[in-house]
């Protein structure tokens, strides 16, 4: 018996979001029919679901999609787990301090000003995500 409360057979990945790496985005199924509930989950359990700029970008994208979808009535925001390192669970431990530089949070190694949106470089846009959640016209 698994301690994982996520039952994959009850959820279906949302189409168009197959490229997500730091977030998972699913739609609730009941008897094969899609339900008005979506599940947005942090997917970095190895670091207690700490977020980085890429995570925030994906989180904003999924939450905005849920906000704009008229057939979505509820957004469940959670964290995946457990950690493969130690079996621990977490919703989200905050910003990933391993990638925080002197000027703030940095994008992944190998990216440059030419490959990153300049408006997002060097900092997390978590405040925009918080605002999106706060003013979401649906329960989160």
Model-identified regions with their sequence ranges:
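Glycine- (often His-adjacent) and acidic-residue-rich active-site loop
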Residues: 47, 79-131
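Hydrophobic core positions within the conserved protein kinase catalytic domain
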Residues: 63, 130-133
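Charged catalytic carboxylate motif
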Residues: 54, 58, 125, 132
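Conserved CoA-thioester-binding segment of acyl-CoA-metabolizing enzymes
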Residues: 1-83
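Solvent-exposed polar/charged
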Residues: 68, 134-135
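A short, small-residue-rich loop immediately preceding and capping a beta-strand
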Residues: 137-140
């Amino acid at each position: 018996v698994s301690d994982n409360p996520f039952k994959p057979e009850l959820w279906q990945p949302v189409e168009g979001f197959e490229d997500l790496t730091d977030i998972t985005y699913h739609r609730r199924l009941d008897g094969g029919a899609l339900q008005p509930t979506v599940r947005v989950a942090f997917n970095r359990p190895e670091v207690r679901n700490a977020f980085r700029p890429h995570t925030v970008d994906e989180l904003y994208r999924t939450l905005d999609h849920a906000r704009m979808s008229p057939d979505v009535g509820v957004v469940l925001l959670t964290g995946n787990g457990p950690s493969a390192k130690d079996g621990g669970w977490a919703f989200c431990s905050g910003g990933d301090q391993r990638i925080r530089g002197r000027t703030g949070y940095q994008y992944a190694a190998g990216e440059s000003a030419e490959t990153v949106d300049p408006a997002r470089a060097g900092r997390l846009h978590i405040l925009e995500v918080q605002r999106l959640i706060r003013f979401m016209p649906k329960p989160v």
